[in-house]
C-alpha cells in the first residue's frame, strides 16, 4: 500500500477484487470446505452531503460477506456517515459513475435489510427507553423499534432468538433488568444482542467502546471475538485497541475521504497513524491487540 493521500481513491492491494483476496486468504488458512463468500458492499464514487457541506467524498469500497474490517480515523472524519450510507440512513448524491450496492441491490426495504445486517450505533438508549427490560429491548430488534410496544405481535420463536442472542453476548442475567438501570457496558451488550436476533451475516459497530470503562471495554472485545467466528464485523472506531485480532483489514479515513485501505499489518505503523491523526504516535502490539499513546 502507498502513503496516505487525499485523492479519495485508496490504492488497492494486488490480486483482484477484495472478495477474491479474502477467498485467497481463506484457502491459505486451510478453509476449503466453506462455500464462496458473497459480495456484501460495493461503493463507487459515493459522495454524501449534509446541508451544503460534502461530508463524504469519492468513496470507493468493497467488502465481502463474512469479512472483518475496521474503519479507522479521527472524530469527525466521516466514519459514522459512511455507516449510515451503508445502512440507508442517508443517501449518496446521484452522479456519473456513482454506485452503492448492498448484496448486489441498489434499494432495500429497511426492515428486510436488518435481517442481513445487524447495526449497533454509538448511542446508548438508556435515557430514551429506561423502563424497557433487557429481554424486551432485544426482541424489539425484530421490529426495528426503540422499545417493545404493546401492539407488536411477539412470537415464541422471537423470544427464543432473543434469549439466544443474550447468551451469545454473555448477558442472560440482564434479561429482567431495566435498561435505564444498566451500566454502559451492560447496555452495549444488550444492544449488540438486539442486533444479532436475526442472526445476520454482517454486524456493523459504530464506536463499540464509546462510554465504556477499561474493564467493560476488555470484556466486550473478548465477547466480540466469539461473534466474529460466525458473522463478519465492520467496525468504525478511533481507538486502536478496538481492532480485534480477527480483523485483518483496515480502512483509514480523514476529512471525509478514504486515504488508505489494506492489510492491518501494513497500515498500522507509527508513521501512518501519526499522519492519520495529526500527532506523533507510539505503537505497541500485545496478544493481537494494538495500542497507541
Model-derived features: where do they sit?
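Conserved ABC ATPase "signature" region
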Residues: 139, 154-174
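Conserved ABC ATPase signature
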Residues: 151-153, 178-182
Amino acid at each position: 500500500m502507498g502513503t496516505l493521500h487525499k485523492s479519495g481513491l485508496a490504492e488497492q492491494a494486488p490480486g483482484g477484487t477484495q472478495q477474491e483476496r479474502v477467498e485467497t486468504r481463506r484457502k491459505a488458512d486451510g478453509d476449503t470446505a466453506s462455500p464462496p463468500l458473497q459480495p456484501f458492499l460495493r461503493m463507487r464514487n459515493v459522495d454524501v452531503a449534509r446541508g451544503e457541506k460534502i461530508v463524504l467524498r469519492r468513496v470507493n469500497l468493497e467488502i465481502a460477506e463474512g469479512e472483518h474490517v475496521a474503519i479507522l480515523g479521527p472524530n469527525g472524519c466521516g466514519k459514522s456517515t459512511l455507516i449510515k450510507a451503508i445502512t440507508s440512513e442517508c443517501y449518496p448524491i446521484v452522479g456519473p459513475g456513482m454506485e452503492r450496492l448492498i448484496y448486489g441491490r441498489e434499494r432495500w426495504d429497511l426492515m428486510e435489510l436488518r435481517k442481513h445486517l445487524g447495526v449497533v450505533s454509538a448511542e446508548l438508549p438508556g435515557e430514551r427507553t429506561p423502563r424497557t427490560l433487557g429481554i424486551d429491548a432485544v426482541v424489539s430488534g425484530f421490529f426495528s423499534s426503540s422499545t417493545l410496544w404493546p401492539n407488536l405481535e411477539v412470537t415464541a420463536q422471537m423470544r427464543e432468538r432473543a434469549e439466544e442472542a443474550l447468551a451469545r453476548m454473555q448477558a442472560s442475567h440482564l434479561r429482567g433488568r431495566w435498561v435505564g438501570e444498566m451500566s454502559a457496558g451492560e447496555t452495549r451488550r444488550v444492544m449488540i444482542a438486539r442486533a444479532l436476533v436475526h442472526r445476520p451475516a454482517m454486524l456493523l459497530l459504530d464506536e463499540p467502546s464509546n462510554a465504556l470503562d477499561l474493564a467493560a471495554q476488555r470484556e466486550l472485545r473478548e465477547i466480540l471475538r466469539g461473534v466474529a467466528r460466525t458473522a463478519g464485523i465492520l467496525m468504525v472506531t478511533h481507538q486502536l485497541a478496538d481492532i480485534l485480532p480477527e480483523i485483518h483489514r483496515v480502512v483509514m479515513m480523514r476529512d471525509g475521504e478514504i486515504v488508505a485501505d489494506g492489510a492491518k499489518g501494513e497500515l498500522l505503523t507509527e508513521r501512518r497513524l501519526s499522519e492519520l491523526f495529526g500527532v506523533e504516535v507510539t505503537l505497541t502490539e500485545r496478544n493481537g491487540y494494538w495500542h497507541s499513546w
